Swiss-Prot record:
It is an enzyme of class 3 (hydrolase). One of its GO terms (molecular function) is glutaminase activity. The keyword Zinc-finger does not apply. Coiled coil: none annotated. This is Glutaminase. Substrate binds at residues 69, 120, 165, 172, 196, 248, 266. The gene is glsA.
């Protein structure tokens, strides 16, 4: 089944999504991280990155917010690049836990591996795997360069957010040392946790995340810079991780209602990948009870459903002028 969608249609639907959702008052900012609690709750932006490099944007698409857990996708890509798909599967895994993103119980139940790079335990383990082992500065450079390659522009560390995260990350400290207990962390636990905390504190925009999603959708080639960031054979591995764990214990509901693999973060960002078609991102700080942006979810669902797109419907989608 073939489906053609015009760029003007996408522009119209993105604008409609913004207008439909911007007045929504549901949710509240993350309050357990002081920096996030004080972000303007009315900020809202959407960006779609087409595979020709064109971005369609509306609202606060260029506001820099904390990438938070969306960074897990980026570092998963980095270790897939450095180690290959099979080694990542062996050292971390790719299973959904069915539990909240910061679950300690999940480690106790599945102590032979941290489950997936897209939950906190697996993400901390992923940071520990980044090469060169033992060199925090070079590992950090690799993490930032990888995000830069994916987004097409450099993220900026939000120092105030980093300090807030570091002062309140008690649960993640427990996770790091529990992983050490089970030999599932591959570098110094404190260093690995700090790298994870820093990467979550990087400032990005909805437009940047849409380009990163577009890079995944485009078989590893950044649509804007045209750089081959990773091998195309990794795309289904990355997309399957996002589909099964992107919304943690609610990933099934998300896929059922939206039809697009997407990753969420408590900074208010959501990044969705529709392979072979486009990348999409939306940002708004107020979160639902599971830590997912209320407006971003509604906006992306609106776009997907209005355009009649779904990763599972088997349609070959062509975007025309």
């Amino acid at each position: 089944m073939d489906k053609k969608i015009s760029i003007s249609q996408i522009k119209e639907v993105v604008q409609q999504a913004y207008e439909q959702v911007k007045g929504n008052t549901g949710g509240k900012n993350a309050d357990y991280i002081p920096y996030l609690a004080n972000i303007d709750k009315n900020l809202f932006g959407i960006s779609v990155c087409l595979l020709n490099g064109q971005t369609i944007t509306v609202g606060d698409f260029d506001y820099r917010f904390g990438i938070e857990s969306v960074s897990k996708v980026h570092t998963a890509i980095l270790i897939l690049r450095q180690y290959g798909a099979q080694k990542v599967l062996e050292m971390i895994g790719a299973d959904a836990t069915g539990l909240p993103f910061n679950s300690i119980i999940a480690i106790l139940l599945e102590n032979d591996h941290p489950s997936t790079p897209l939950v906190n335990a697996g993400a901390i383990s992923a940071c520990s795997m980044v090469t060169p082992i033992g060199n925090s500065d070079k590992k950090w450079d690799a993490i930032v360069q990888n995000i830069t390659d994916l987004c097409g522009s450099a993220p900026q560390l939000i120092e105030e957010l980093y300090k807030s995260e570091t002062a309140t990350n008690f649960n993640n400290r427990s996770i790091a040392w529990l992983l050490k207990n089970y030999n599932r962390i591959y570098d110094d636990p404190n260093m690995s946790l700090d790298l994870y905390t820093r990467q979550c504190s990087l400032g990005v925009t909805a437009q940047m995340l849409s380009v990163a999603a577009g890079t995944v959708a485009n078989g590893g080639v950044n649509p804007v810079t045209k750089k081959q960031v990773f091998d195309a054979e990794l795309t289904p591995k990355i997309t399957s991780m996002i589909a099964t764990v992107g919304f943690y214990e609610h990933s099934g509901d998300w896929m059922y209602t939206s039809g697009i693999p997407a990753k969420t973060g408590v900074g208010g960002g959501v990044m969705g990948v529709l392979p072979g078609v486009f990348g999409v991102s939306a940002f708004a700080p107020p979160l639902d009870g599971s830590g997912n942006s209320v407006k971003a979810q509604l906006a992306i669902k609106y776009i997907m459903n209005k355009l009649g797109l779904n990763v599972f419907n088997g349609a070959r989608v062509t975007i025309v002028d």
